Amino acid sequence: YHHVRSGKENNLKAIEALDKAIETDETNARAHALKACTIGGGYGKGYYEDPDKMMDMGLEHVKKSLEADENDFEVQRISSAIAQSNKEFNKSIEHAKKGHSINPNDPRILDRYGTCLVKLDNVDEGLKHLHLALSLDPIPQGAATSCSRYDALAIGYYCKEDFEKCISWGEKIQYMGASTWLTILYSISKNDDISKVKEHNIYKKYENDFKETNWEKTIHNMHFRPEDSKHTNLLEFSNKMFPNIKIVEKTA
């Protein structure tokens, strides 16, 4: 329950509950995988006092989950997500592909495999999986809206360079994340002109929410291959849209 709820308190309660499950059965592959997933989420949101220690713990639980049952699709799904966040891109695709082969109609693995493919390998194939995930399970477990599904499709169409569809899916999102907002702004600039971006409603709506964003870090955490144009184009665009203005104080 707690691992699909948002917030630091739920994150820590989820870890506590999963620890109890592991104490009961050390070979519980799903519990090890879910603990790794929970730690990965908390790490990304800055919940921990010693984040590196927690990430090492998460990686250890990924290893234990695979040793316990590599034929559990959830184990493969979570292993794929962790591998991609560690920039182990080929390993991420392998885990997602295996998870999909085990259970090809589960929306959780469809979302993971689709996300993996659009960012790293085969955009068209990935989009098929993302659309199927939306049709099978419009509001994912623990969510109140379809925002995460729309988010995945907006980024997927950015990866396809279908900028109109990136914008149209992005406009459906109620709770916008910084990375998706950036891909939508980039798409607006390609559909029109970069000088028109700040006139668009979606820019005005979220401008204040993301004015303190570290864009280099945000793009890094989207987990594209660093040499890929999907990554470098966003870096160049963010530098033009949000230049780092350094104020040099005059000395007497």
Positions of the model-derived regions?
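Acidic, proline/glycine-rich low-complexity intrinsically disordered segments
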Residues: 1-109, 113-130, 136, 164-166, ...
